[in-house]
Amino acid sequence: MAFAIAGTLAFLAVSSPALANSSAAEYFRNRANSTNVPELLSNSDKDWYKTLFAAIDSEDWPTVQQMFADRPDGPLHHFARAEYYLDPKSPKVDLDQIQAWLANGVDLPQADQIIQLGLKRGLENPPDLPSQQMLVSQSYAPKRTLPRSVDDGTMPDSIANAIKQKIVADDPDGARVLLDGIDANLSPEARAEWRQRVAWSYYIENQDAQALAMAQTVPVNGAGAWVAEGYWAAGLAAWRLNEFGQAADSFRNASLSSQNPELTAAAYYWASRALIRSRQPEKAAEQLRGAAQLDETLYGMLAREQLGERLPREDRGPDFDLTDWKRLREVPNVRTAVALSEIGRDDDADTVLRYEAKIGDPSEYDSLSRLARELGLPSTQLWMAHNVPIGAKAERALRFPAPRWKPVNGWQVDPALAYAHALQESNFRTSAVSPAQARGLMQITPITVREHAPRLNMSASYVNLSDPGTNLAFGQENLEMLRDAPATGGLLPKIMAAYNAGLTPVTRWNTQVNDEGDPLLYMESIPYWETRSYVAIVMRNYWMYERQAGGASDSRKALAQGMWPTFPELSGTGAVRLSVNDAPVSVRP
């Protein structure tokens, strides 16, 4: 990229007058330290079962057998025996043991496997299993994603790959020449895609006039989801050319043709901005209200902020309470899941609660989902958010699950920010491993372990990144390191970008991205699509977690005012305004 911002970027830090982020931090820290679920196990029970399950996990069968002999019954024995019997390396289980297990109930998720094992041992007349109700799939929270590439055979792979290579090599002119040679043979859908890709290549090279001209061809004899992306590219290019009337028209067309809620809201919001710049404020409010209707999107929340409208309270679901417990306390699987959670067997508790959701009374579903949240089981919350009985409706808060985990060194950053990253990085899967060997909740890389282990008084060779507390500790250390890096300047959008792409690209983008000191323009002009999407998604996640805490959002206020939100400290968030060429800097009072 040949462009470099002339002059310097002047900035002034402004501390936030309201410590909204501190209320979110306090909310999530308090959740980790208190619960409305009664304890079912005594301390001695917890110690005993931890020892028993550790013996099963380590295949210490003599210890397992002795412990069952010494204590033949207890609240988690039925589950523990199922784990013991079904382990492929455990001693052979005879028919009498299987029949005794089945006589104690078949509500556990292992019951079918136990019956199958019994049939191999000569079991006759096996008991009926509970019937499973139909669960209806629910929609996912919207994400800013590109349309799928058109694969209809009209674009030869060789030319597609050659165009991509030109784009990667920062050669949009070369990509354009290749496209011109095949354009007439493409389907309308493929034509829209490849014209948009070339237009975007011009845009990220800061060749805005060429980007606008190319983007305007996308809807001409083009069709499909890529048309909206073409209008979007045209809008951004026109914006940077100060052609705000053209930008407004392009953004409005993008909002009308978009098939993605996040892009739709973004287009409405940017149309409003462009109309203000083109001195048509009477038309801007209508566009802003269009964005505000999509209140679970990044720009929908920004629009609500700018309009001064309160966000719906439904995103902070009701807490688990005594009424819920009275409804569930006699359900065997509920008691099993609660007890498993008490001894740290979250994966097992997750399995049991999911199974209960399938076999239980549909009227218990709401209470069951609130129990999953109260126990801090993120995987269960996500699953229940997207699988509900007929006639039920999942609370939206479940799509942004709140665990009860905390870093081994205590919270140093806003938990809402850590959860926002973890949701996008791993979907809260503690065992997630990427092709680059990034591991766990916050996808910690080997180099991150080596860099931060000494500060955490850990040996890099013996770090268990599958442990949530350990992984969160490394994640927040990484966030603080990025906060302090000169490349980010402590600015939240750049910190998020660096978490995904690394500091080297962010350093390069500081001079290559023509953002005009505008944080939203920066976010929309990040050259890497993955990082551009990542920043939008994580920022949205962060605001959704702040909504759960019931407080305002300093970072959302800052962006709505055209300011850069800074890293959210536990005491609150500041904001800065950047200007190009040392122009005067206005600040928020």
Q: Where are the predicted features?
A:
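Catalytic glycan-binding domains that act on GlcNAc-containing polysaccharides
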Residues: 82-86, 95-108, 117, 188-192, ...
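Alpha-helical tetratricopeptide repeat
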Residues: 42-52, 81-82, 156-163, 193-196, ...
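Alpha-helical, heptad-rich or low-complexity scaffold/stalk segments
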Residues: 21, 29-123, 127, 132, ...
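Solenoid-like repeat scaffolds
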Residues: 34-41, 65-75, 85-89, 100-108, ...
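Compositionally biased, proline/threonine/alanine/serine-rich low-complexity intrinsically disordered stretches
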Residues: 19-41, 127-156, 165-169, 564-589
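Cleavable N-terminal signal peptides
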Residues: 7-8, 18
